[in-house]
Amino acid sequence: MALSVPAAAQAPRSANSAGSAYRINPGDELEILVWGDERLQRSVLVLPDGTFAFPLVGQVQAIGRLPAELERVITAGLQPQYRGPVPQVTVSVKKPSGYQFSVIGKVGSPGTFTPGRYVNALEALAIAGGPTTFANMGSAKIIRKAGDRVFVVPVRLQDALKGDISTLNALPRIESGDTLVIP
């Protein structure tokens, strides 16, 4: 059965979804809109294996992809179901619960955080309430797991806190699962 949607029912591309730098993680809740076909509009949860099911498309591999990439995958999957152009598909991250990191050590509020956007080491420190009085900002580090391996990434937060622009630009981005340690 082929569906037809008039061109007037197609929505313009969302600048927000196309320009988003957020990559999908397991546990994220996505809002998927198929303009002009309300039956296909829904929220989906990305499963622990990094996939979700979508009507007429089947299983979609989402982990590590940008929302704009998922828009293209779903559009391609819907193509055989329509006569004429496929309605505009928009994917947005409704609840980014898959991007979490921890901050431990001498900070105001140590814990695990889900900021809803990517942050660098200095922003992660701010989210955790900033350093306490005796924090050693020159010895901060990120503990990062990649498969079975563990990496330690040194972070020079001391210079960044003093306003050194070159240091601010070089701060590493916190990845999902990272632990920022402030000794």
Where are these regions (language model features)?
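Bacterial N-terminal signal peptides
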Residues: M1-S4
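Ser/Thr/Pro/Gly-biased, low-complexity, turn-/loop-rich segments
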Residues: A7-P183
